Amino acid sequence: MSSALANIYARLPVSFTHGRGVWLWDTGERRYLDALAGIGVSCLGHGHPGLVAAISEQAARLIHTSNIYEVPQQAALARRLAELSGMSEVLFSNSGSEANEAAIKLARYYGYKQGNTHAHIITMDSSWHGRTLATLAATGSDKARQGFGPMPSGFIQVPYNDLPAIRAAGEAEPRVTAVLLEVLQGEGGIRPSDMAFLRGVRQLCTERGWLLMIDEVQSGIGRTGKWFAHQWADIRPDVMTLAKGLAGGVPIGAMLAAGPAAGVFAPGSHGTTFGGGPLACAAGLAVIDAIEQEGLLANAHEVGAHLHAALASELAGVPGIIEVRGRGLMLGIELDRPCGILATRAMEAGLLINVTRERVVRLLPPLILSGEEADQIVRILVPLIKQFLAQQQ
């Protein structure tokens, strides 16, 4: 790769030229089963005809005008997202970090309007919300923050899935205005929240007048088998953030607001040059259409359950395996030791995965994954894991 590139990525030694469905081909025409989907972004896989057509047609007509003007594609996508989520309004951006940054700003402005000039937000340990300074401060990872201090203040981190800890944090700090959490922690090791915990947090936020802000950047847009992972708990947040799969690979982010969070921002309180442009929103509309027309929510749920069960069965009783967990097509396999080398070994075997939290194999395949392709993942990955663990004894 070019020496002119900033040295911030530990890249695997492969370059891809094209893709089709769940498959990618490298410069040597070798084929790989993509079980990572660009870290959960390529939800329709590669070369999806509907998405390609929508992007091509929109690019030929108009790519960018800015938010100085009306953007019909933006308005249409906002309506679709509001219908699917039950939320009231949508603010578009370009990434998950930007969407979460907007949510943090909204929570602070919400507090400010109530006379709270130093609003605090409760966040979870092992969480991940982005790489801007505010989202890093919200993220539950000291390693990610190292060297970038001083961090913005106003964040209180508590253990995940611990409702009493959230309640205690609110009692200790009267300036709390919001709780920010992931329903299913992605970078945190595919850690699911308890449904009772989510319902309890919803009730607590309502009682205290706090905003419940849910980060669905990785778990949203059908990945768990529902449009948004919090829908499994039958709750609605006040703020929700989206990105990754929303436009199938075209950069986009979104912050949705409802209830007390709706109408907090006014003209001039936030903004973006590129966010919600015609191209990205046309892609987002195509993604939603494809998920609906091709039954991909049901597919993610059913094929994900099949893959989960197959992995759990094949790895049951294997020394060194802690747990197979997740929901839909957002799955993790936790080992009892660092296993980053498995990403390289899987790539060498024709399978694309990654490892998070040093010892959790993460699977985020496209929502179009078939049962047969799920079985191929199992056939490649399970022997690699068993071999790795046997060598480490």
Curated annotation (Swiss-Prot):
One of its GO terms (biological process) is L-arginine biosynthetic process. It is found in: Cytoplasm. Its cofactor is pyridoxal 5'-phosphate. Pathway: Amino-acid biosynthesis; L-arginine biosynthesis; N(2)-acetyl-L-ornithine from L-glutamate: step 4/4. It comes from the Bacteria. Pyridoxal 5'-phosphate binds at residues 215-218, 273. PANTHER family: ACETYLORNITHINE AMINOTRANSFERASE, MITOCHONDRIAL, AMINOTRANSFERASE CLASS III. Belongs to the class-III pyridoxal-phosphate-dependent aminotransferase family. ArgD subfamily. This is Acetylornithine aminotransferase 1. It comes from Bordetella bronchiseptica (strain ATCC BAA-588 / NCTC 13252 / RB50) (Alcaligenes bronchisepticus).
